[in-house]
Structure formats: structure tokens, C-alpha cells
Amino acid sequence: MNTHGFFRRLWPPRSEKKTPPCWPVPSAKQPITDTPLVVFDLETTGLNQRKDQVISIGAVKILPAGLPMRSSFYELLNIPLDKYPRDGQLIHGLTQHDLQQGKDPATALESFLHYAQNHLWFAFHAEFDRHMLSRAVQQYLGVHYDPAPIDIALLAPLLNPGHNGLIYLDDWLNHFGLDNSTRHNALGDALATAELLLILKQQALRAGYHSWAEVLLAAQRHQKLGQQQNTALLMF
């Protein structure tokens, strides 16, 4: 009796784990002046981080020399229709027909990650986009990936003392007199956010910061101090 074949049928060999693709992200400890950046924005079917889906991705690169206007990324994702309203209502100006013209989600996501690799990631109110992107990559590519984007909404109050009341992206765009007329899709939002980040980058350099890690640490401390001060005021 071929016992080897018998036991192989009972316990088939485990399939080898697929090595996940590598989309490297540079260290935030590198000098600000030498670090290429990517600003991204997602549009989703809603704000439920467990159930809603990513429907479009927009991104813009910022190189050490500045903002190359032609280096942008935008894709619609052809997600299953049961994840999208069937009554023809618009979400972010998109219809079911628009969505059906989009790319296969796995293809779109892989293209985006390839586009963004070797760049330090940024987003405005980044935590939501971070979670939604990581979940989509897990769902469609079967790998865990977290580029840990830096939250621009956290950096702006640090570099602009006395303007803690500015919360939303439009608030900051209006504050700096930046044009927000392009904000009609994920790419428009990413472009507007990139223009804001360029201003913050110059402010960080003038303030004496050498790396984005230093700016982020100072911003986290600034936020914590503000929260403590607000708590103290509520106690009186």
C-alpha cells in the first residue's frame, strides 16, 4: 500500500503563502526637502467604515522640486452594484453608469499603489481614508497594507497658531485664498489638498523643522495640549 499517497489525500499539502507585493514608503525621518510626497483622496459610497465601499481614487505627487501638474492619478472602481444605490441617485456626481465604466477594483487598487510607492503619503482627515483603503486592499488584493498617511488636518493648526477653529479642507483653502473650484471629484480634492500641503511644507521649513516626523510629533503634542486646555476650561 502506498501510505505516502494515502496520507497525502487525507492531509493535502498546504499551499504556499503568496508573498504580498511590496509598495515601499520612504521614512518620514528623511529631510523634508528630499522627500517625494503623494496626496490622495477617496470617494466612498458612505461613511460606514465596515460596510461602505471605495468608488474612486484621486492622487497627486509632490516632488522635492515642486508640484508636477501632469503627474496625477484618477480611477473609478467598478464595484458590485449591490454596493451602490439602484435608484439612479448621484453620489459625488457619479451614477451607476459611470461606475460600470470603472476598472476592476483589484486592477485599480494595484495601479494606485504602484503609482504611490516610494512617496510619503498625506491626506486631509487621513484616518478615514486610511481605514477604507486598507480594507479595500485586503478585500480585493488579499494583502494587508497600511501606508500610514500623515494627516494634513493635524499639521495645519500647528503651523498656523491661532487658527484652531479651521476644521474642514474648505476652511483652510479659503484661509489661504486657494481655489477650490476643482473640488468635484477625488482628483480635484487631492489637487486642492496638495496645494495646501505645499504651503504647509514651506511653513514647516521656515519654522526650522527638518523632517516630517518632527512636524508630526510636534503636531500631536500641540493637539494633546489643546485638548487638555479645553478639558481644564470645562472644569471651571
Write out the residue ranges for each language-model feature.
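A polyampholytic, Gly/Pro-enriched intrinsically disordered region
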Residues: 163-179
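Acidic, divalent-metal-coordinating active-site segment for phosphoryl/phosphodiester hydrolysis
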Residues: 185-196
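Short, amphipathic alpha-helical segments that act as regulatory/interfacial helices
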Residues: 134, 194-201
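Active-site catalytic microenvironments for nucleophilic, acid-base chemistry
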Residues: 139, 158, 175, 199-203
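Conserved non-catalytic scaffold segment of RNase H-like nuclease domains
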Residues: 9-134, 138, 146, 174-184, ...
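Short alpha-helix plus adjacent loop in nuclease-associated cores
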Residues: 150-164
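Acidic two-metal-ion nuclease catalytic site recognized across multiple nuclease folds
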Residues: 2-27, 198-236
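Short hydrophobic/aromatic-enriched beta-strand-loop microsegments
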Residues: 143-150
